[in-house]
């Protein structure tokens, strides 16, 4: 089970805590009503919604491009990508929506999510494969889960999410 996490960490070693358990840090977020975790090492930045330049004839889940400190970033609407109901409110700086910038294969992508959470230190011993009864929508973009006290935290598989 640890191997799946090592894969998404690009071979980085986990940190041993004072109780001897290996732990990794995950940025938590919400997409629709589901809680997700993203390895902190994958996160480049977290932004409030920015001005987006539309790309003519692009796929519906690609909202456009933003300029982040001189680098061009492709903006992905995660809800559209997963076929989930879309928000009726526009994406603006006052909304709770955030843009989580990740790097994948040398390119930057901004994932538009509903809400950002905390950074959690989670023991690798608690990581499990996806449950068999997990919705196919979530299973396709999740590498596995952490069962926390009040929720199931899916670990986002950025590579599968960005297969557009």
Predicted region positions:
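An acidic, low-aromatic, low-complexity terminal/linker signal
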Residues: 1-164
């Amino acid at each position: 089970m640890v191997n799946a996490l090592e894969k998404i960490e690009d071979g980085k070693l986990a940190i041993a805590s004072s109780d001897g358990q290996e732990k990794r840090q995950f940025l938590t977020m919400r997409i629709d009503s589901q809680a997700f975790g993203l390895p902190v090492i994958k996160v480049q930045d977290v932004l409030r919604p920015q001005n987006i330049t539309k790309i003519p004839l692009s796929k519906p889940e690609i909202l456009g491009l933003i300029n982040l400190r001189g680098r061009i970033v492709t903006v992905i609407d995660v809800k559209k990508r997963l076929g989930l109901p879309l928000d009726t409110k526009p994406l603006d700086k006052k909304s709770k929506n955030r843009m989580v910038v990740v790097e994948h294969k040398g390119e930057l992508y901004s994932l538009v999510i509903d809400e950002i959470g905390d950074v959690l230190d989670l023991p690798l011993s608690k990581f499990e494969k996806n449950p068999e009864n997990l919705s196919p929508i979530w299973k396709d973009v999740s590498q596995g889960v952490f069962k926390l006290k009040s929720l199931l935290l899916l670990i986002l598989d950025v590579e599968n999410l960005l297969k557009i």
